[in-house]
């Protein structure tokens, strides 16, 4: 009860949705973010003449973050997991299939995380992860539009150049996937339409053949795919 009271007092002091409001008033749209096993990405569409605003906003996001709503946002992620994984007919099976598919590699962990981890994740855990991975040396910016490279470089140095290095090297992934010696098969039943998932280990995403593999996936997957037909 005491903790909840402190959370409510904190919320009373916050400016709600200020980040989104600044972008919207500048004519920006489509602000969102996503996470997968390899990266976290933030994207937004802004008018070309608001390029400096983008550099300022995104560098401020990374410069000195204060996790004011950490616990409420942690609750949001837990609820998202319930909706997307635990409350769908096939969600738990898809998650366990992925965990079975990978023997040793960290890809066996779903990007949203296990509920037991989400419930025990502390602010100190999040800050340690942030200081390690959300560092300038681990950052890539992709800009598309009516802008020049020279202009972008000047603004990048002006704003992102303020962010100090973390001093904590990103640890290498040293656990490599073991060679698969036999077919893995999972059979499950649920209140849903029949579904077949076929998974293969192929090439890393930076490999020259990864683009062809993406096209093959598109050709085979979904109700318009060759396998379905």
Positions of PLM-derived features:
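Non-catalytic, conformational "gating/processing" segments within enzyme and secreted inhibitor domains
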Residues: 67, 74-75, 94, 123-159
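Non-catalytic beta-strand/loop surface segments
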Residues: 4-49, 83-138, 162-207, 218-229
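Short, conserved charged micro-motifs
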Residues: 51-53, 149-153, 208
